[in-house]
A protein has these predicted regions:
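Active-site-proximal specificity loops/subdomain of glycosyltransferases
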Residues: 1-38
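A short acidic (Asp/Glu
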Residues: 1-4, 25-26, 51-55, 79-82, ...
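Conserved catalytic core of nucleotide-sugar-dependent glycosyltransferases
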Residues: 34, 48-121
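Short coil/turn segments at beta-strand junctions that form active-site/ligand-binding loops
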Residues: 36-39, 64, 143-145
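Short beta-strand-to-loop acidic/aromatic patch adjacent to the donor-nucleotide binding site
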Residues: 37-48
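Hydrophobic/aromatic beta-strand patches that form the interior of the parallel beta-sheet core
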Residues: 41, 68, 147-149
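C-terminal catalytic/acceptor-binding lobe
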Residues: 111-112, 116-167
Length: 167
């Protein structure tokens, strides 16, 4: 599989670091190799995307978001899990966007936001699996905005976490 991917893009780095350490490795790579204005997209290995990802990510940033996810997590529709959830709805060129308190580790942001929130990213990744909910809650307390498109443009590939309304 890696050789097939390398035939498309030659800058593939294999690691055996685990979930949190792999994410932090990518954060460090982005900070060291990209300009602060550049966007990076972190994608977990168990997500499937619809087409036109780049246009949708650009659309999410156009509504003022610091962090954009194309995953419409079904937990946001579970009143027992989020009994007081209040969201702002934004209209982009391609989608509706909703402010959400958290998402999984598949999201886009600017390198500048990684630098600004580096302490939170590291604090959230001190265990094997990142504390994504904590991470986004903490960053939003600093004024960062996380939006999710509705309907989603990607989905988690676990049956209980499929994006609603997308076949």
């Amino acid at each position: 599989f890696v050789s097939e991917i390398k035939s498309i893009h030659d800058n593939i780095v294999e690691t055996a670091l685990g979930n949190s350490k792999s994410f932090l490795n990518c954060v460090e790579y982005a900070i060291q190799n990209f300009d602060e204005s550049e966007r990076v997209y972190f994608v977990e290995n168990d997500y499937l995307h619809l087409s036109d990802v780049e246009n949708y990510l650009n659309d999410g940033f156009s509504v003022g978001a610091s962090f954009v996810t194309l995953y419409d997590h079904p937990d946001k529709y579970n009143i027992s899990q989020y009994p007081t959830l209040q969201s702002k709805i934004f209209v982009g060129e391609h989608s509706h966007w909703r402010s959400v308190p958290s998402t999984c580790m598949t999201f886009a942001t600017h390198v500048a936001s990684l630098i600004k929130n580096k302490d939170i990213l590291y604090e959230s990744c001190c265990h094997e699996v990142p504390s994504d909910w904590y991470m986004f809650e903490k960053m939003q307390s600093r004024g960062e905005l996380l939006v999710s498109c509705m309907p989603g443009r990607c989905t988690h590939l676990e049956r209980d976490y499929l994006t609603p309304l997308v076949d």
